[in-house]
Amino acid sequence: HIRWQDTHGVAVDAEGLVYVKHRTMTSQPQDAVVVFDRKGKFVRSFGKEFHGGGHGVDVRRDGNQEFLYLCDNKGYIAKSTLKGEIVWKQAAPKIAPYQKAKPFEVKTPGKYGKGHLFSPTNIAFAPDGGFWVGDGYGSHYIIKYDKNAKVVGHFGGAGDGPGKLRTPHGLWWDDRKGRQPALVVADRANARLQYFTAEGKHL
């Protein structure tokens, strides 16, 4: 039995299976990723380790296999197989904005401690094989990782001027025809969309 609460991310794999990332604040850990077939029938669930912090999720093919990339606003990002086996898991990046970041620990479900500066909300895949992570509930930066999940840059930060962000949530690489390719960021608290180059320059 899964108690359904806040749904924050939905992704679809090549077979049409739908992966829903949700967050519950129950005292007992529950699976945070629930998988359905294309008709809405339950297939499986997993991810008790994401209990209380489940947020963005997306699917990408690496080589001949698809993987899930997951954001947990308890302070880390992860890559897993489609059945939930963790490939890697990373906490706050070791760059200037996060030098004082501490490992995130949920002492009371639903309540966040002070000093936890990395609280990622969503992910987008870059054309070079890397990816971006939006630190929506943390320090409001967009962090760029290469294809090996190594941090190679960051931009944004808290503010309401051009290129600054407050609670960046949805992000995606927009390469539709007739448009300049750009990373689009849903700058939630500023109630706007912002556009950036792949290198992080504000457009």
Regions found by a protein language model. Give the residues of each.
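A short loop-to-beta-strand structural motif that recurs across blades of beta-propeller domains
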Residues: 30-34, 75-78, 140-144, 192-194
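Beta-propeller domains
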Residues: 8, 15, 19-47
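Mature catalytic domains of secreted/periplasmic carbohydrate-active enzymes
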Residues: 28-29, 60-61, 79-81, 86
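Beta-rich, blade/repeat-based domains predominating
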Residues: 2-15, 31, 50-66, 99-130, ...
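Short loop/turn segments that connect beta-strands within beta-propeller blades
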Residues: 36-41, 81-85, 146-150, 197-201
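Beta-propeller fold detector
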Residues: 44-47, 87-104, 152-157, 203
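Secretory-pathway ectodomains
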Residues: 58, 66-73, 77-80, 131
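Conserved beta-strand positions in repeat-built beta-propeller and related beta-rich domains
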Residues: 20-27, 68-73, 115, 133-136, ...
